[in-house]
Amino acid sequence: MKKILIIEDNRILAENFERILRSNFSISKAYSAQEAILQIDKNLPDLILLDILLEGHSAFALLNELQSYADTSKIPIVICSDLASELDFESLKPFNIRHIFDKSQVYPQELRKKIEGILNE
């Protein structure tokens, strides 16, 4: 079963994302960038679902760190953020960003279908 790491500081949203995805994927969650790094070190995910606005350590710093290691630089990343409209997809492609969802407009079926498509490439 493919593994997804959800990095979301809002625990309720993280639980909602897990409910949407858990029937098809093995899910782990991290509520901060620091916790995400520990999770990734323990169990390399096949895909990361990432919120950009995290407390403490910036998600952009996390993206830079992931790019600095061969084993993590190839992990596909899907962003789900309130800042989706402000993000430039083209400038984020070097970080292996595959899709950007606006949290307020994402539908469960759409999220699941996009993630399945990315993991089946």
Predicted features along the sequence, with ranges:
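C-terminal output helix
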Residues: S104-I115
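Conserved acidic carboxylate
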Residues: E8
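Acidic, metal-coordinating helix/loop segments flanking the phosphotransfer/catalytic sites
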Residues: K29-L47
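As written
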Residues: A59, S68, S91-H99
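The feature encodes the CheY-like receiver
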Residues: E55, S85
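Two-component/phosphorelay signaling modules centered on CheY-like receiver
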Residues: R11-K29
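Acidic catalytic/metal-coordinating carboxylates
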Residues: S32, S58-N64
